[in-house]
């Protein structure tokens, strides 16, 4: 299930006693082919937040929300950093940023939007639900 996958992905980055992550996951099953690239994307986002973003300071946090739009048949992932130092557009794109922007989304014919707001990084990914949802046989 997605909630457990997200909790497992962020666990190595959590500091005991601090509420660094708020997760609002959709209870869906992600297929194994989609789970690894999603976790790799989250790993890169966490690494960047620890090095440059909200998780560099004690009061910083990351909100992770997902939702399914049944009508459009899409899965939406949103990462929002808050309470960290002001951020700006990076002067160059690292391999990690390339992975975030192109890895998960492009593998499943989706799209990624990265915004470097003064209040923190926001990453939104949309992919077709059918490409990532595990199908349970009846």
Please identify what each model-predicted range represents.
Residues 1-12, 65-67:
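Short beta-to-alpha transition helix within the HATPase_c
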Residues 14-60, 91:
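Conserved short strand/loop->alpha-helix "switch" segment adjacent to the catalytic nucleotide/phosphoryl-transfer site
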Residues 19, 73-77, 121:
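Short beta-strand element(s) in the Bergerat
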Residues 22, 63-65, 113-115, 124:
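Short beta-strand patches within cytosolic ATPase/nucleotide-binding catalytic cores
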Residues 59-72, 80-81:
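Short beta-strand/loop element within the Bergerat-fold HATPase_c
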Residues 85, 117-124:
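Glycine-rich nucleotide-binding loop
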Residues 87-113:
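ATP phosphate-binding glycine-rich loop and adjacent ATP-lid/helix-beta elements
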Residues 127-138:
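C-terminal end segment of the histidine kinase catalytic
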